[in-house]
Amino acid sequence: MEQNLPFVNVGFIDNAYNDRVLPLLGKIDNGHLFKWFLVLIWKIAALAFLLGGVYLTIAGIFGDTGYIKMNITNELFSGGQKAGASFGLVIGLVLSLVCAWYLYSNTKKRTDELNSQEYGDLLHFIFLTMIPRTITLAGEIAFTLIMYAGLMQIIAGLDGAAAYAPLLSYGDLFMQIPGVNMAAALVPSSVHGNYDNFVNDMSMGIMGVAAAFFVLIAYYIYREIYNYGMKLVCALIAFLPRLALPIAIRKKAE
């Protein structure tokens, strides 16, 4: 046991030093603390998708600005529109809960994969291990939300009134996240339908579903470009010592 204070042994201080301080410094030195923190961020994000999604789904139904007040009991709507909005509520409630669960499950899977990766050093872990997986996860999140928006628009077009899509509010949040914000514009703030505009409503929904796949492909291409760029950087760094030696010899000869 290492002594903490100079010239004197104090049992509980020495115990705290050896049991708390030294192990923490060891985790910092070997990088386990950095890896734990980065993985923790992903774990929190996964839980936020699940709990936040459930909260938004339940909370958005009620209140003065809730779906029921704005669509089902709205005196400006006809009986047919209210019936359609009721159908949109049931389907939207189920799909929103499924979407929240899927976002959680997807993020949890990627978090487990990140946690299983070996930690060599901080730069390698961030730039070669974490960022490519972050790009993949961002693409999958964007794909899920755009697919969700497209399906909700199709439901709204079919019922001729509205569809309950509370998770569309995630689009405003993702506008602040680098990497995801470039697809956030494809997630509308709300979806509505009208039989007078049936063809356009259905076309928008189908285009949204198709766009989800194109966005996912774009993110995977983005990841491949990033990986290729990192290979070039690593190759350049490895080549620099070989380049420096002839230059040094030439300068010495001069």
Predicted segments, located by residue:
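Terminal helix-to-tail segments of small alpha-helical proteins
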Residues: T134-A165, Y220-N227, A253
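Hydrophobic alpha-helical membrane-embedded segments
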Residues: S86-K108
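Canonical alpha-helical transmembrane segments of integral membrane proteins
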Residues: V39-I61, G139-Q153
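Juxtamembrane/interface segments at transmembrane-helix termini
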Residues: W101-E113, I155-A163, I221-L240
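Membrane-interface extramembranous regions at the lipid-water interface
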Residues: E2-A45, I72-A83, Y104-L145, P241, ...
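Extended alpha-helical segments
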Residues: E2-L5, S203, M207-E254
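Membrane-helix interface motif
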Residues: V54-I72, G150-V180
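Membrane-interface segments at the starts/ends of alpha-helical transmembrane spans
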Residues: I28-V39, K69-G92, I126-T129, Y170-V215
